[in-house]
Amino acid sequence: MKYLLTIAIVAMMSAFTLAGDPSIHIFKVKSIEGGTIDFSKFKGKKILVVNTASKCGFTPQYEALEKVYEEYKDKLVIVGFPANNFREQEPGSDAEISEFCKARFGVKFPLASKISVKGDDTAPIYKWLTTKTENGVLDATIKWNFNKFLLDENGKMIAYFDSKVTPDSEEILKYLK
């Protein structure tokens, strides 16, 4: 009986371990500048993750993202993930995207290298963000550009916001005040 109980406990612990780490701090992604964005370096700050595009009706949200980043950067990191998943609204190279964001919106928050946020080639970090069994909180479907995920200081999921929720809306800012 003790033997069966031990096996059951080990099996449960293994299943829990395989279920995923409920912290985004396990991820490292390629920066648009060619280096690495290490999410473990953001421990102690909230993180807002956004899939972005340069030729989208929501592209002006870059301005609000930068404004929020500048105002709350002592306790918030914003990481943009350019993606070309929706009507090819992010066709440029990493260099072109970086130049556009800096020149047009003065973006200083970290931008990752262009990735896929949906489909068979979804980047691992976006699989984690959109899958409850991975992030421990919610399932989300990325339906368009500028969807946002807010994570707490421990890298745990707080909330998901669709494209229509602007970065400077009270829906997001209430978590930062």
Task: Tell where the protein language model's regions lie, with residue ranges.
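Amphipathic alpha-helical repeat scaffolds
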Residues: 31, 51-55
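Short, internal strand/loop/helix patches
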Residues: 24, 95-144
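Thiol-/selenol-based redox modules, centered on thioredoxin-like
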Residues: 124-127, 131-177
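Conserved helix-turn-beta segment immediately C-terminal to the redox Cys motif
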Residues: 43-47, 55, 59-84, 102-105
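Thiol-based oxidoreductase modules, predominantly thioredoxin-like and allied folds used
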Residues: 75-93, 108-119
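N-terminal "domain-start" segment that seeds a small globular fold
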Residues: 18-40, 123-124
